Amino acid sequence: MSVTIAIGSDHAGFDQKKILVSFLEEKGYTVHDFGTYSTDSVDYPDIAHQVADSIQKKEYDLGVLLCGSGNGVAITANRHPGVRAALCWNEAIARLAKKHTNANILCFPARFVSVDDMQQMISAFLGEVFEHGRHEKRIGKIE
């Protein structure tokens, strides 16, 4: 079964998001783009809520969100029960997001991280497995 990915960004991450959609589709993933669809200014919560809702409902396996700092989309997504959105800025953090927190949304700071680094972080994340054990107990305390 193919991994399905929900992706979205505000205007600050629009250009990078387009590249990420192509990157993921070329790797064989099924991707749904929740917008935005231009560089016109939008409010990041409008996009982040859609992606997080789709993850919460288990319509997609992984979410990817971008905004200027990554903080806004991460905070918004984490308001949804069952969503574990991780702000990632390097490959090690992305790996740990999967291994230790079983994150289901990756959030990127579009103004501070290159699209090449985002691609590496997504690949690293998808190549990891959740370690369970003590981490599962900790996640239970969040839920």
List the predicted regions and their residue ranges.
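SAM-dependent methyltransferases
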Residues: 1-4, 25-27, 51, 59-60
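Short active-site oxyanion
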Residues: 4-5, 60-63, 82-84
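Glycine-rich phosphate/diphosphate-binding loop of Rossmann-like nucleotide-binding domains
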Residues: 6-26
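C-terminal binding/interaction regions
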Residues: 6-8, 12, 91-143
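A general structural signal for well-ordered alpha-helical segments in protein cores
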Residues: 17, 44, 48, 70-74, ...
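A short beta-strand-loop structural module common to alpha/beta enzyme folds
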Residues: 30-41
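Short, structured active-site "lid" loops
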Residues: 47-65, 69
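Mid-chain, well-packed structural core segment of small domains
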Residues: 65-107, 111
